């Protein structure tokens, strides 16, 4: 996969940084992680399956492979649980992930600049579900970065099954490892900001890698309460660790203004429902999901007593 990335990246402005990214990624893949043999064995088994062409048939990223052995494929893919982002369909096997990513995609795609021929970065890409959608939408190259190693192997598993591979890649890197060069036309940061101890640093790091007039799509948890500027959870939020700050819409707009982004627009605010986030048999033995994270007596509150999750999507330009 890294050799393919080199081949495609060198035909774009990412030529300036691709060798550095490959060296960093190689180092991560060579780390001593006891799960890697299991993950690599799963991918080895997946490679014995027939491949198919990739397209998007709502809600699924669909791989139209024929004569798939559903039993062995499902068994191999479940060696890579939990599957958070998706859903995917391979032949007639439906990989119903915890999140219905298509719902978020449909909320934002009509409003952003066309991705055709763009160099696109997907920060915190997970297994690459959205990164694939960016590539299908015509990106010259769509690069996801995801430091959690398992999700990189999930990406490779899906990639193994595709015979019309678009220019899409996921590397096991965090945003701070991307050189501060203005190379990306469009940058997505979705579900990342609230996990940052330093939101200003994150916004500035995003800006550093964007071309002049490049577009940022920022999706994050917010607080939608009158006269409340932000909430800093002590402990967990909706049973999530490392949630550092939930801003109001106006506070988030101010943060973007302070970072000197321009043309700031709020596209959408949506309360997360169990239609979009739910437990499935693809998330493993820990079958808790949104309904378990909310107060059973008041679904407008989390189990900790905070307002239930709402997510906002902003777009802006450098």
UniProtKB/Swiss-Prot annotation:
User: For binding carboxy-S-adenosyl-L-methionine, which residues are annotated in this chain's numbering?
Assistant: 85, 99, 104, 124, 175-176, 190, 194, 311
* Gene3D superfamilies, alphabetized: Vaccinia Virus protein VP39
Protein's GO biological process: tRNA wobble uridine modification
**Which SUPFAM superfamilies does this entry report, sorted A to Z?**
S-adenosyl-L-methionine-dependent methyltransferases
Q: Which Pfam families match?
A: Methyltransf_9
Q: List the disulfide bonds.
A: none
Mind listing the UniProt keywords for this protein, alphabetically?
Answer: Transferase, tRNA processing
Gene Ontology molecular functions: transferase activity, transferring alkyl or aryl (other than methyl) groups
InterPro entries (alphabetical): CmoB (IPR010017), Mo5U34_MeTrfas-like (IPR027555), SAM-dependent_MTases_sf (IPR029063)
The catalytic activity, as recorded, is:
carboxy-S-adenosyl-L-methionine + 5-hydroxyuridine(34) in tRNA = 5-carboxymethoxyuridine(34) in tRNA + S-adenosyl-L-homocysteine + H(+)
Q: What is its EC number?
A: 2.5.1.-
Question: Its quaternary structure?
Answer: Homotetramer.
Q: What role does this protein play?
A: Catalyzes carboxymethyl transfer from carboxy-S-adenosyl-L-methionine (Cx-SAM) to 5-hydroxyuridine (ho5U) to form 5-carboxymethoxyuridine (cmo5U) at position 34 in tRNAs.
- Give the UniProt family note: Belongs to the class I-like SAM-binding methyltransferase superfamily. CmoB family.
* Protein name (record): tRNA U34 carboxymethyltransferase
> What is the protein's species of origin?
Ruthia magnifica subsp. Calyptogena magnifica
Q: Which gene encodes it?
A: cmoB
